[in-house]
Amino acid sequence: MEDMFSPLIEVENLRREINRHNQLYYVQDNPEISDAQYDTLIRRLKELEEAHPELVTPDSPTQRVGAEPLKAFGIVNHPYPLLSLANAFSDTELEAWYQRVKKLLGNIPFQIDCEPKMDGLAVALTYRNGKFATGATRGDGFQGENITRNLRTIHSIPLNAEPNAPPVFEVRGEVYLSKNGFAKLNRERADKGLPLFANPRNAAAGSLRQLDPSVTAERPLDIFIYALGYSEDSLLPDSHWQILDYFSKIGFRINPLNRLVNTLEEAKEYYRQMAANRASLPYEADGVVFKVDSVSLQHRLGDVGREPRWAIAYKFPAEQVMTRLKKIGISVGRTGTLNPFAVLEPVNVGGVVVKQAALHNEDDILRKDIREGDTVIIQRAGEVIPEVVAPVLSKRNPESKPFRMEESLFNPNLNRTACPVCGGEIYRPAGEAMHYCANVSCPAQFERQLEHFVSRGAMDIRGIGESLSVILAQQGLVKNVSDLYYLTTADLLQLPRMGEKSADNIIDAIADSKTRPLDRVIFGLGVRHVGNETATLLSRHYGNIWALAKTGLGELQTIPDIGDKIASSIVAYFSEEKNVAVIRRLEEAGVRLTSDQKPVNKNMPFSGMEFVVTGKLESFSREEAQEKIRSLGGTAKDNVTKATNYLVVGADAGSKLTKARSMGVKELSEREFINMLEQS
């Protein structure tokens, strides 16, 4: 009998000891034994479990890794939604949030929890009877992907809760890669000849979504718990701060930089300190989260859309770095615009290597006094688009000269300003900021037109991107957009590095694009000043391309949102015989030039309603959401105005949400928007 029980006793003792050392090492950062001693304990436990497989349990430390790869992730329904946070970008916006909370609470005093806003991936961890049962991604806030097996590989996530933990509870946390862990991971990938991750967040997200948990286990992922989702223990304190302290004591990792403050000024000071020390943090953070501490007051404040009223994320300013502006280059757009851009010494900005940045136009360059050879400050606007903020005047060469578009475009061979691609005449219309190439046959214009025509927002022809558009134009295979529909596999096989399968796929994609809606065709034609919103208006008003082609200036000006400039541009486009000839060839090739949408009438569900969509939606893309709005008679706009009736709010909404709130625009969560669609 003693022989029977001794392995069980040793296994239980080993698990208890290993879990204790995991807690000391991964959570408390206070190890008692060396890595070699820890490995010895793990090795002995594995030996015993291999000899006695009946003793293996899901919560054993050996079971963090080793399961078979999944074919797909399952779905987990969140018992309580994982809401996203409203953003503040200034002290003024933070103060506005604070005053709204005070007003809603009737001036009841409240404390504020201050927490670094980790730039990772939100997850929900559910424990049942002391065991880690389920782990899921945020998903759309209501449903997430079941990534339990991958989360088990993260050593700072306890597989067992302490005996005094609630019988069933869910905690929420942010999985992330430290800066050092990210650098180490990319070094290893470089050594193996694998593509590098752009930034720690992408690396963490990609690691958690591996179907094979052994791959996740190789990534140095970590977690901070930031909230209690729900609990069956009704005796937990009425304080977010005290709840996190409780979970810290029973084995969960809580950010040691969290603070509890009593006033708005203390909250602002916390933000200033975190922003000042951002670069020295061991992980990426993009702001600070402020929360009303009292749980009962949180419930009283409730939610609006998909955001809690009792919390806000105060984002850090865009990361700025210095580099040298080597040259101001000029590119040619599809409508002939001459677009200046900065050629930079490559520099890492927020995890992305930036080599070029937009400069908009000559007036903007002169306003900022940006010159070639300057040391300049670069940031990624909205953490996405690289832009030149300003020159560093103390580092400027005293012999540098202000930028002049006409000087930059002067062609000594022609003894005049000229398009840098075709040598065509240059002009700048009165009242406009842009210079234009006057040559409608400019090859650079057509390359951009072709790229625009095949783009996702227009005809969405998969397989033809920027580089292939240029090759097709330069090889003379496509002289106007209608030529695409007369290409053959044999034509494409003439191109360098083009295989038969790739050529067949492109021909199939071109054929598939023939059934795109009329508004996509109109947008794809690239009529000056006609964006996708205007293209949709024209499609629904006229119903077919030939009715639009024959319309006059006066009729166009009667259509809402079609101003004089747009109307004149449309008439000018269709008065060009070469443009009409292209449309005829599109029709002959079988491209659909009529609309199957019902004409807008006052009885359609969304008739008279104007929507703006912001943030990232889970159920469909922004373009798909806009199409659904238009199909029900509504108007989908890109910007919030006084005419906006509804703002559809997805994850990570930014300035549009702030503007909408200041104007009293009604907000819709994604789920509320879907309900409106279903009821219509």
Curated annotation (Swiss-Prot):
DNA ligase that catalyzes the formation of phosphodiester linkages between 5'-phosphoryl and 3'-hydroxyl groups in double-stranded DNA using NAD as a coenzyme and as the energy source for the reaction. It is essential for DNA replication and repair of damaged DNA. The active site is at 117 (n6-amp-lysine intermediate). Residues 601-680 form the BRCT domain. It comes from Dehalococcoides mccartyi (strain ATCC BAA-2100 / JCM 16839 / KCTC 5957 / BAV1). The lineage of its organism: Bacteria, Bacillati, Chloroflexota, Dehalococcoidia, Dehalococcoidales. GO terms for molecular function: DNA binding; DNA ligase (NAD+) activity; metal ion binding. The gene is ligA. SUPFAM superfamilies: BRCT domain (SSF52113), DNA ligase/mRNA capping enzyme, catalytic domain (SSF56091), Nucleic acid-binding proteins (SSF50249), RuvA domain 2-like (SSF47781). Its EC number is 6.5.1.2. The keyword Manganese applies. This is DNA ligase.
